């Protein structure tokens, strides 16, 4: 017997776990009792419990000791004690993968599986299937078939679930049990029917036609199990998504009919499936929303929670569809369950009118301190969405957020608030000073280094442009005096930006920099010394290059290049142009709030998609002399989705070459493709110099082939080209079941869509946080200006979107957002042209009958300016 502990022990935590200090060696020593005669079921049961506890705690058992314990345990089958026997089954399952010769218990388990004791049969089947491999499965196949159609539900369910696990190991054998599974699917028992449907689906899931037939059969005949109905809804929903069938499909009609089912679980599953369907209109959502509305007034808390949580998701995309539920949601604000109340309010914030915002904020503030951090983050996300919807309400939101910022809370909660305030500042320039003041107050007592450095970065970026920049200096310098090394270093960088932008503040900033040069940390001292020297030069170009805009290279790429440079000493200085550019600008601040689950911060910066491509291409000998990878495009589809071969292309741009990576998938199971390459015919002076074929392309296994193209040297302005593409390969027919190919093959080809190279393939986006400084830094030596009429464009928003996508450059200073009711706008774009040449574009837009655009281009290379203007023209 396990000693009963009193409540006091339980609360203190001492003694609440009788197995807390178990030692593996002692337990294995105790296991020798299994060999004693007569068997003591009670003691053996306790020892087996200890072994399972140790295994579940992750204790490592060596193969020898595990096998010895396993063999000793097999003697316990001589006992007729029911509890001990079932504990043996559990132990067999746990030790199946770490012991040798576990098949020794096969005969004992088979005997129990076919015996008269129903209480043994189900667990024996599960244990037997755990230790059975492909070679032994046929020996028990007859028993498994009988068990699947057994009249005892627990036996039938055990056989079905075990079969489901064995599908991964022996698909071909389990496939022969389909008839028995279909018979079990007509069982009156709800669990047997559910498990039978699950097995049937997993046997057929790779055959869309078979799944469709199965769905048609069960949707017409009906089911008794609500669990099976839920699975059927999920299968139908998945099939709808894969086939991109419209809402006129019989499958959608079936899901909609489940909204009228008698079982609440089925009704909710159907409503949830409709809500999560892509491209669902408000009209198609209406029946699902009506059902969820009814659930909002259910006496069951779980139903109310499910309904309001799902409505919350609907409100993100279709707020108008949820408006009809506002009254029910308002009733849930006072719900005794705080999670339900929070979700109700955040849903109302997404669907409510501008006039209801203040009232809702007041209601939230009354209980926000009582809810968990996870739900506080949900509230902050709703407020962030509301700020974008009703920008005029930013002051009310800002006050509410600042109060929340003062409350106690974890890192994720505080980060969500800080991100929300930053997004309000960026969306509403008039709220900048208020927001910065709240953030300054927060960093005075901030225990999170990540947040403090983020806010200091924002102060350095936005503070110098405010009417009174001097008031932020005190808050920043306080961090240098009081905080950790990382925060002090960030504060030094922020101070430098004030000195670089404001001549009046420069003397004061230089004095503070001198103090920072005496810091105990070398990172802080180095930064202070560096900025001190740059600021003393009083040159705007230097300030722009080294203080405002910083590096725009890939950090993992820079690390690798510097390491390579140190391994091979050279008299030449390190060339920054040898480092790949960052695909996502380092300085870009994303204010999207991350989910609460991601509380662990990455210790090392993960390599970007482009860094991975750089490594993959560098491993191919033919591409090793091309230099650093400049840019990789998004994949371009060259075939339709449902064709026999699926081909997509990724364009990799280098200084003087382009590599075209063709990712090919063979969707025919009766063919093996070999020596696969894509032949390219250019329309311009581009020259294909090498093909690297994919050696083999088996069914459903993607492979890559490459084409190397030289860019025209004699005409650097030739940035656009169209390639006609043909896939060529050797076909070998093969057996669809075994995949065994014929000895002989034949050559064949497949015409692909044309592939275009355009201006964005030669330009990498680079964010310039201070565009004005970058504009001055590049200078007007190669500045050119032209005016264009965009006759077909009707709005400034459309014009801005078209220019950005056409040039493939990075919008700066949030100039991609056009203010409301404006007839003119200025768009700032920045990028780096192939070869490492900075290029900046200023486009002045005016709206009249169409849109008139005055484009000014600056670059460090005249050819680049000509390329941009020629492409726009």
UniProtKB/Swiss-Prot annotation:
It is found in: Cytoplasm; Golgi apparatus membrane; Cytoplasmic vesicle, COPI-coated vesicle membrane. Residues 1-11 have a biased composition (Basic and acidic residues). Keywords: Cytoplasm, Cytoplasmic vesicle, ER-Golgi transport, Golgi apparatus, Membrane, Protein transport, Repeat, Transport. InterPro entries: ARM-like, ARM-type_fold, Clathrin/coatomer_adapt-like_N, Clathrin_app_Ig-like_sf, Coatomer/calthrin_app_sub_C, Coatomer_g_Cpla, Coatomer_gsu, Coatomer_gsu_app_Ig-like_dom. GO terms for cellular component: COPI vesicle coat; endoplasmic reticulum; endoplasmic reticulum-Golgi intermediate compartment; Golgi membrane. Residues 1-21 are annotated as: Disordered. HEAT repeats lie at residues 64-101, 283-320, 321-355, 356-392, 394-430, 467-504. It is a peripheral membrane protein. It comes from the Eukaryota. One of its GO terms (biological process) is intracellular protein transport. GO terms for molecular function: structural molecule activity. Its main location: cytoplasm. Coiled coil: none annotated. The keyword Nucleotidyltransferase does not apply. Belongs to the COPG family. The coatomer is a cytosolic protein complex that binds to dilysine motifs and reversibly associates with Golgi non-clathrin-coated vesicles, which further mediate biosynthetic protein transport from the ER, via the Golgi up to the trans Golgi network. Coatomer complex is required for budding from Golgi membranes, and is essential for the retrograde Golgi-to-ER transport of dilysine-tagged proteins. Oligomeric complex. This is Coatomer subunit gamma-2. It comes from Takifugu rubripes. The gene is copg2.
